[in-house]
């Protein structure tokens, strides 16, 4: 009995648990239905309120526009009430006269008789219809086709010429499949899905309830919920990242700060978001950097009041400097002095001991005592500092220097720039001066034995002083006028500031002025950069025989022997020792390229893609695999065997096949060719000086030296291109620009162009075709002719293939331009076919074949 009772009690308990679960599920479903009804009423109420708010806002806008007219109408009604009749309404009801036409000779008179006039018909002269014209966008350079402009896999539509009927032209195998319309959820529906999903989850019961409420499939609801969940996650991450402070970005390095800009910047066109090469390009770092821009320190002027060159102002020692130690306590009003000459000078002057000063290299500079800044003339020479025998010689020496304008006791920082802390530290005593002087002399002797340049010890921490003369002393001493606290060097350098500094050294060398002005503007001063450069002993990138910018005498920076020295550039090549290259006119390009050009074969050009080889190109180099030459945009070294080395042509020789560039179908590059140069002025604005009498004649496309082209009605077919000014034979007329599309895309577009009896397709290379139908320039309207006066030629310009139009003969002004479209035997229209007797073989013509049938 006990067992039976226990079993029965267990069954009763299980039934009770099942009943509780069922009640909870029912309560949950009932709560879900109530929640859905509540959300529905809430969203509907919000929608009604938003509609009312929009309606009220629109009503106010309408009132603002209508109020002037309403006030004018009310004023007119007031005038009618006062007895003034409405003349407009009265004239409409009772006109003065009714006219059916004008009599001869009375068209200009105001009053016309009321009798009817019989109108005469006028026959207009017959005017010929203008040719059909399609809208197009002007391009001054080629562009890659946008992804959404492709016709592959899309239904193409064209208009029949005669009837104007709209027809569909698509391949049967590429008929677009009908896409199911995707459900667009409203803002209210998104709110319901998101809130219910967050509160109740996305179980089957919840999905069924949402399906009944929104009349949407469960799969669409689940997909939409996942999209909303992903958006919420992204918004949360963006919100957490948006709360940064201003200083956090400075804690990142330059590479992290420019991470998003590296791929957006085109290093071939020097623009962001390049439409020719794409906005996301692989970053290729050249193995050899360009030499930094250099100038001598003696040729520069201080860039600001915080410039380190201010510390190099001339310091002339007055008579009171020698007796400063003994009279400092008596003259409390005398200004404190920092040290300007060697610590041996004041001690020797006070004791009357003769002192031999070492010979140093100084520059001949003109001194302006009013400003305290050296006016440097750039005249450099070596002068011997005279022997100082007594302290009384100092004033006489100072007067002599003013007459000769050449400072013999002038101090110059030879290998480093002292910090302001050292220059301002002027109150230190002369304790230990003798020891310091001994150490300095020993270091000078050691430097002589090693062969290093002797550092100028006239300014250091504990043994020299700069003296401020008495007012009205007349000694003409030059000092630094302002040593403000703001000019003190900053000790903290953020990572991005350090990276910017290193990049500045790479570009400008050890030029603190240019680094601070161009890369650290607002972050560091010129003096900060100079002190950081000295304290950290940063070695200059790409050391060579280039003189150190901090050395006044043009000596090279010591310690360069162990560094890797890259090949010297043309700028720093020694005179009389020009580097000789194994070079011939037929070995500049790749052998296969030269054979193809020399053989006159009309083969397609190869698309160039820069290689990322680190040093020398091997068998796996993309350029070698693609049978193209390495260019200046590649990462390989300049000594690469596959590198195109340009030409060495003399003046006016680059327009013949003797020029390697011209023979290879290339334009000369001023960065590669030896004697080809580009100048934009006379040098007054700091541009590169001229290197010869005339510019190279094989850079027309690069410099955009095109002729003026006019658009007009052609006598042959449709529209035509006309020349404004007369040109000689082989003159460059302009560039044929358009969209860069693939060959597969060109085949699909060509079917539409064939039906419309027009084509603007031009084969460019093995990967791209130019299409000027939608985008291009006015040369797209140049028509085909069996006897053309122009010819098209594909040229390789700055790493890209471009189509140039050149004069085949002398062309007079206002003459229409024609060139051969290179039609096939049965492709040319009737008007464009050659006469039967003309069977001239023109297979050796160097310009490429265009996919054209007729230009309108």
Curated annotation (Swiss-Prot):
Cited SMART domains: CXC, SANT, SET
Annotated ranges, domain CXC: 594-693
GO MF annotations in UniProt: histone H3K27 trimethyltransferase activity; single-stranded RNA binding
Extent of Basic residues compositional bias: 846-856
Motif residue range(s): Nuclear localization signal: 838-845
Residue ranges of the region described as Disordered: 1-34, 66-87, 366-473, 827-856
Phenotype seen when the gene is deleted: The double mutant clf-50 swn-1 is hypersensitive to abscisic acid (ABA) associated with reduced ABA-responsive genes repression by histone H3 'Lys-27' methylation (H3K27me3).
Domain SANT per the UniProt entry, residue ranges: 489-539
Keyword Repressor: yes
Localisation: Nucleus
EC primary class: transferase
Any coiled-coil regions, as ranges: 22-49
Composition bias type Polar residues, residue spans: 1-11, 68-87, 393-419
Catalytic activity: L-lysyl(27)-[histone H3] + 3 S-adenosyl-L-methionine = N(6),N(6),N(6)-trimethyl-L-lysyl(27)-[histone H3] + 3 S-adenosyl-L-homocysteine + 3 H(+)
Cellular component terms per the entry's GO annotation: chromatin silencing complex; nucleus; PcG protein complex; plasmodesma
GO biological process, one term: methylation
Enzyme Commission identifier(s): 2.1.1.356
Source species, domain of life: Eukaryota
Alphabetical keyword list: Abscisic acid signaling pathway, Chromatin regulator, Coiled coil, Methyltransferase, Nucleus, Repressor, S-adenosyl-L-methionine, Transcription, Transcription regulation, Transferase
Pfam families to which the protein is assigned, alphabetical: preSET_CXC, SET
UniProt subunit comment: Component of the plant homeodomain / polycomb repressive complex 2 (PHD-PRC2) large complex during prolonged cold, composed of core PRC2 components (VRN2, EZA1, FIE and MSI1), and three related PHD finger proteins (VIL1, VIL2 and VIN3) that mediates histone H3 trimethylation on 'Lys-27' H3K27me3. Interacts with TAF13. Interacts with EOL1. Interacts (via SANT domain) with HXK1 in the nucleus.
Similarity field: Belongs to the class V-like SAM-binding methyltransferase superfamily. Histone-lysine methyltransferase family. EZ subfamily.
Name of the protein: Histone-lysine N-methyltransferase EZA1
Lineage: Eukaryota, Viridiplantae, Streptophyta, Embryophyta, Tracheophyta
């Amino acid at each position: 009995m006990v067992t039976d009772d226990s079993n029965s009690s267990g069954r009763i308990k299980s039934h009770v648990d099942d009943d509780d679960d069922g009640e909870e599920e029912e309560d949950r479903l009932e709560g879900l239905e109530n929640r859905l009804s509540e959300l529905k009423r809430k969203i509907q109420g919000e929608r009604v309120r938003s509609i009312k708010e929009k309606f009220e806002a629109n009503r106010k806008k309408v009132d603002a526009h209508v109020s002037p007219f309403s006030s004018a109408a009310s004023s007119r009604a007031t005038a009618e009430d006062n007895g003034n009749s409405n003349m407009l309404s009265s004239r409409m009801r009772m006109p003065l006269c009714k006219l059916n036409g004008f009599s001869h000779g009375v068209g200009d008179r105001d009053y016309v008789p009321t009798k009817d006039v019989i109108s005469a018909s006028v026959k207009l002269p017959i005017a010929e219809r203008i040719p059909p014209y399609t809208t197009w966008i002007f391009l001054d350079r080629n562009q890659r086709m946008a992804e959404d402009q492709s016709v592959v896999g899309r239904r193409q539509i064209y208009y029949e010429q005669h009837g104007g009927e709209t027809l569909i032209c698509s391949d049967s195998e590429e008929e677009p499949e009908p896409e199911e319309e995707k459900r667009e959820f409203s803002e209210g529906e998104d709110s319901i899905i998101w809130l219910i999903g967050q509160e109740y989850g996305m179980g089957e019961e919840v999905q069924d309830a949402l399906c009944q409420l929104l009349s949407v499939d469960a799969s669409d609801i689940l997909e939409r919920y996942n999209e909303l969940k992903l958006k919420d996650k992204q918004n949360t991450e963006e919100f957490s990242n948006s709360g940064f402070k201003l200083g956090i970005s400075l804690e990142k390095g330059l590479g992290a700060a420019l991470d998003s800009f590296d791929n957006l910047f085109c290093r071939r066109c020097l623009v962001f978001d390049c439409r020719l090469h794409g906005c996301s390009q692989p970053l290729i770092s050249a193995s050899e950097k360009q030499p930094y821009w250099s100038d001598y320190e003696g040729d520069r002027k201080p860039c600001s009041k915080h410039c380190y060159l201010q510390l190099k102002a001339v310091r002339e020692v007055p008579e009171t400097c020698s007796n400063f130690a003994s009279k400092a306590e008596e003259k409390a009003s005398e200004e404190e002095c920092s040290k300007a000459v060697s610590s041996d000078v004041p001690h020797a002057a006070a004791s009357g001991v003769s002192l031999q000063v070492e010979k140093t290299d100084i520059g001949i500079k003109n001194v302006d005592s009013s400003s305290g800044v050296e006016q440097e003339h750039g005249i450099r020479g070596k002068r011997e500092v005279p022997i100082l025998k007594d302290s009384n010689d100092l004033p006489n020496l100072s007067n002599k220097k003013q007459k000769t304008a050449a400072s013999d006791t002038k101090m110059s920082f030879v290998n480093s720039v002292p910090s302001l802390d050292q220059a301002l530290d002027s109150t230190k005593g002369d304790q230990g001066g003798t020891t310091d002087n001994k150490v300095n002399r020993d270091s000078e002797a050691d430097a002589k034995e090693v062969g290093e340049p002797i550092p100028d010890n006239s300014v250091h921490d504990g043994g020299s002083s700069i003296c401020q003369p008495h007012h009205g002393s007349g000694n003409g001493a030059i000092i630094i006028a302002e040593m403000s606290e703001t000019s003190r060097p900053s000790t903290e350098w953020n990572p991005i500031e350090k990276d910017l500094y290193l990049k500045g050294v790479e570009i400008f060398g050890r030029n603190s002025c240019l680094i601070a002005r161009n890369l650290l503007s607002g972050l560091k001063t010129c003096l900060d950069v100079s002190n950081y450069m000295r304290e950290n002993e940063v070695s200059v990138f790409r050391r060579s025989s280039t003189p150190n910018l901090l050395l006044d005498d043009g000596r090279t920076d010591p310690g360069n022997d162990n560094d890797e020295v890259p090949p010297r550039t043309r700028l720093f090549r020694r005179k009389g020792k020009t580097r000789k290259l194994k070079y011939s006119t037929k070995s500049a390009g790749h052998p296969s390229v030269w054979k193809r050009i020399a053989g006159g074969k009309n083969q397609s050009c190869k698309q160039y893609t820069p290689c990322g080889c680190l040093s020398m190109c091997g068998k796996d180099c993309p350029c070698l695999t693609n049978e193209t030459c390495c260019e200046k945009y590649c990462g390989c070294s300049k000594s690469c065997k596959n590198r195109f080395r340009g030409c060495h042509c003399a003046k006016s020789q680059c327009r013949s096949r003797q020029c390697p560039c011209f023979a290879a179908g290339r334009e000369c590059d001023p960065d590669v060719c030896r004697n080809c140069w580009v100048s934009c002025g006379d040098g007054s604005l700091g541009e590169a000086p001229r290197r010869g009498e005339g510019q190279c004649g094989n850079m027309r496309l690069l410099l955009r030296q095109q002729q003026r082209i006019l658009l007009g009605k052609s006598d042959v077919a449709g529209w035509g291109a006309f020349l404004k000014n007369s040109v000689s034979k082989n003159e460059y007329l302009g560039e044929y620009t358009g969209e860069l599309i693939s060959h597969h895309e060109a085949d699909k577009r060509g079917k539409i162009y064939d039906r419309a009896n027009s084509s603007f397709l031009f084969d460019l290379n093995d990967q791209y075709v130019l299409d000027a139908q939608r985008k291009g320039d006015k040369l797209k309207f140049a028509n085909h002719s069996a006897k053309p006066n122009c010819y098209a030629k594909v040229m390789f310009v700055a790493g890209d293939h471009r189509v140039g139009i050149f004069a085949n003969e002398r062309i007079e002004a206002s003459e229409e331009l024609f060139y051969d479209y290179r039609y096939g035997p049965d492709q040319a229209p009737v008007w464009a076919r050659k006469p039967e007797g003309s069977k001239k073989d023109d297979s050796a013509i160097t310009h490429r074949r265009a996919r054209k049938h007729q230009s309108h």
